[in-house]
Regions:
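Transmembrane-helix signature of 12-pass secondary carriers
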Residues: 1-494
Length: 494
């Protein structure tokens, strides 16, 4: 029965189901995309080193991997609707955990919660749609989930650029303390803004019915029929109940598929599909999204320009997802896969060449910086044009960068067996905090963290070891033209 032939109340409920599923996709997209806009401000104000920041970024993927492994099991045990509600609650909980965080551990915890939420949503919402929607609406439900997932990434980028404009306005006032305070407010606010969709998703999941197939498998036939009647006419609901009963009868009589799934014609396509899926992740799509703004900043764009580049990237990603769904049946999977793979190769090659060209003028001034280390085995450095010129001169590279050209500095240092890196500092950022190098930001506070940092490291020795500057890399910041070339290359990637 077509959707138009259903009673009005059934059509309204089906639209509500699609809305709730769409909110699930939107949350998934926000989970993936929100960190890119917040990361530059988090890096500038949190005092975390580069390794800690990378873990904050990657924690959402860790949570997603963990929850994806158990999502199906939880959905069978607790029910589809309850797991969706749980995923929404986890997302809502993660926002204040992150936005109110004053330290490394709460940030990681909040990001892990976001990842767990995303993993549950990514598995359970499509499963729920497949079991609840009428056959002629299932394709629409899957498409809406995927479109709103990419739209969630766009929304996260738009939130980021709004706060980028605000930061730019405060920067023009010329007060470093106010700029630092507002950057701290900015990254927290970016996460707060993503809270309302999570609340709406939780409310929506409470209002929908449980999956009729899950209810039927639990022996709750009348509840399953009631759930079906919310989205179907009586005749169609009874017909689907009959199909469920027939499937159950087949299983109870011990009827099995006679052909082995381990035959060559099944195994090879399965292995190839797994390899292709693994390769789509190995090309770094999640990292490109999470670090998009940071990549564009390092390629030569200003803060506002970098956020615009991220907005363009997410919009192209959204449009290409729409185009892919429209063309997949017309042009075929192989054609789209070939086009996409070619685009990825060209994009990554172009970005690599552009960064390689910029970094060919990189200078290591580690010896000069090591000489600055005092008796306390720590170092605080205001990195500006004068400091850059001093370090370059000491490294025998005087004049490597023009007097008015911005340079970036990243310091890799160690205490004993433990290493860390400073966030990237720029000589043209008069509002930036000093580069701080100390034992607390490198040596783990306890043995548990030390094990994950370096399983073979000697923690007690590191607490007494002197500071060693391993690399102090000064790189001329490319111009905006180079930055826009990188942005265009990333659009091809999208």
């Amino acid at each position: 029965m077509s959707e138009s032939a259903l009673p009005r109340k059934n059509n309204a409920y089906n639209r509500f189901l699609l809305l709730v599923a769409g909110l699930g996709g939107l949350l998934y997209g926000v989970d993936v995309g929100i960190i890119a806009g917040a990361l530059p401000y988090l890096e500038a104000t949190s005092g975390l080193n580069a390794g800690q920041l990378s873990i904050v970024v990657a924690a959402v993927l860790l949570g997603s991997v963990i929850s994806t492994l158990f999502a199906g099991m939880l959905a069978d045990w607790m029910g589809r609707r309850l797991v969706m509600t749980l995923s929404g609650i986890l997302f809502v909980t993660s926002i204040p955990t992150i936005a109110l965080a004053h330290g490394y551990e709460p940030l990681v915890l909040g990001r892990v919660l976001q990842g767990i939420s995303a993993g549950l949503i990514g598995v359970v919402v499509p499963l729920y749609l497949a079991e609840c929607l009428t056959p002629d609406s299932r394709g629409k439900g899957t498409a809406i989930f995927q479109w709103l997932l990419t739209l969630g990434i766009v929304a996260a980028a738009l939130v980021g650029i709004y706060f980028s404009f605000r930061v730019d306005e405060v920067t023009k006032l010329g007060d470093p303390a106010k700029v630092l305070a507002f950057k701290d407010t900015a990254w927290r606010s970016i996460f707060w803004v993503s809270l309302p969709p999570g609340v709406l998703f939780v409310i929506g999941t409470v209002m929908v019915a449980e999956s009729p197939r899950w209810l039927f498998r639990r022996g709750r036939t009348e509840a399953a029929r009631a759930a079906l009647l919310r989205s179907r006419a009586v005749a169609q609901a009874d017909a689907e109940l009959g199909e469920m009963a027939a499937e159950t009868a087949k299983r109870s009589t011990g009827e099995r598929v006679k052909e082995s799934l381990l035959r060559r014609k099944y195994v090879i396509p399965f292995v190839l599909a797994c390899i292709i899926l693994a390769c789509t992740q190995a090309v770094g799509i999640n990292s490109i999204i999470a670090y998009n703004t940071t990549i564009l900043l390092q390629s030569g764009l200003s803060d506002v320009q970098a956020h615009w580049g991220y907005v363009f990237f997410t919009i192209v990603n959204f449009l290409m997802t729409f185009a892919g769904v429209m063309l997949v049946d017309r042009k075929g999977r192989k054609f789209l896969l070939s086009i996409g793979t070619t685009g990825l190769f060209i994009s990554l090659l172009a970005v690599g060449i552009l960064f390689s060209r910029a970094e060919s003028r990189r200078v290591d001034s580690s010896r000069a910086m090591q000489a600055m280390v005092g008796a306390g085995q720590k170092l605080s450095l205001v990195y500006d044009h004068k400091t850059a010129d001093t370090l370059l001169t000491a490294a025998g590279k005087a004049g490597q960068a023009a007097a008015d050209q911005a340079t970036s500095l990243i310091v890799i240092y160690s205490y004993g067996d433990f290493r860390a890196a400073t966030p990237v500092a720029r000589s043209d950022d008069a509002m930036a905090k000093p580069v701080e190098i100390n034992r607390e930001s490198c040596v783990p506070a306890n043995k548990v963290v030390a094990f994950f940092s370096n399983p073979f490291g000697n923690l007690e020795a590191a607490r007494q070891a002197p500071l060693k500057i391993e690399n102090a890399l000064i790189t001329p910041v490319p111009g905006a033209g180079n930055g826009w070339l990188v942005a265009i290359s990333l659009l091809v990637y999208a």
